[in-house]
Amino acid sequence: MRRSVLMAAHRAYAEPGNGAALSMATLLRWLAGAGFDAAAITSGLIEQAPDLTIVQHHDRLGLRRQAGAARAVVTGHDGPVALIAVETDRRPDPVGDAQYGALAAEMVTARRPTHILTYGADPCLGPALAAARALGAQVVTVVHAAGYTNRAYFQQTDRVVTHSGFMARFLASQIGLHSTTMPPAMSWPAVVARDPDPVFLTFINPAAHKGIVPFAALAQRLARERPDIPILVVASGGRVAALAALPALADHPALLVCPPRDPREIYGITKLLLVPTPAAEPFGRVAAEAMMNGIPPLVSDRGGLPEAVGAGGIVLPLPEWLTHAADRLPTDAEMSPWFDTIVRLWDDDAAYATASGAAHQASAALYDETRQRQRTVDYFIDPGPFPPLFAP
């Protein structure tokens, strides 16, 4: 039986620094490697890299522009995956949405895929997804975020993938949704540093929902008591302004900020990774990637983070009042478990070696690429029948 998969997502393909986009691109490559005829129809919506234009991004991917379209349409390949994209504006607009939706519907009719892969719940994709199902395709929606608590988001979906038991339970409790839990697709060669020289305590993406407030409290105390511990913050242009607005960060003598780049470069200079997320994180990709590099991640006890690290990370509490909307710093006492753990692992070589070994071991058990690739392929070739998407 000929199997084919079309990823339809009103987002930029494999956007740098965007875990969801990178995961979906990896998943497509896995399916292509298993014999699926794989293609993607994407757009110009960039979510995590405000300094990157879609033209620059598509040029880096080696895509070619077609003449005569109302907006630029580009085509090319990502290895075995055929790519076509509309260079819409980086934010949704009616004209771009309509053009993208029409092109997606054309692709469905032309390619007649056996499977549609999608994420983001974009309304302009509704007609294309409905047409695919009418032609017998199976629509698989992957949930990367926590906001999809309306059954209407899944109106044209046959099966749903979530990335943690936490997220599966949350959606089941909110809207009665049945889903299959699988980790996001992650390529080890794309994230594992070749020649690591770990020197930094690293914090990635200093946004409110990622924990900039508890991070600032830790940085302030480290500046007073342990200024010898260098801190690296990985931040895009828009996030740098948020950092500059926090007086607590001005005192640290060894706090460096760098833009998002190849994750292997970041993990290659990271000794400990901070993930003090106050929000209910659906998974925690950076924590998993850190463990692949033998870097102990220090993660909050919120959402799917404890699940993502298993026995390979250190799960630490945040004060109950602390949410992503908090506008005051937690006290030293409230953040002491974090501070004490950082200092212990920084100073005690034996303790660090034990934690690093646990990270390596857990990542191999949880995220071995060969096993995850096979599990993904098995999921897509399963002919069913499948349980109802929603509980009665």
Report each predicted region and the residues it spans.
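N-terminal subdomain of nucleotide-sugar transferases
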Residues: M1-A67, P392
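A conserved catalytic-core segment of Leloir-type glycosyltransferases
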Residues: I46-A110
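Donor nucleotide-sugar binding/catalytic pocket of nucleotide-sugar-dependent glycosyltransferases
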Residues: D158-V191, H209
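Conserved catalytic-core segment of nucleotide-activated headgroup transferases in glycan assembly
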Residues: W188-A190, D195-D251, V257
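A charged, aromatic-enriched C-terminal amphipathic alpha-helix characteristic of glycosyltransferases
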Residues: L329, A333, P337, W346-F380
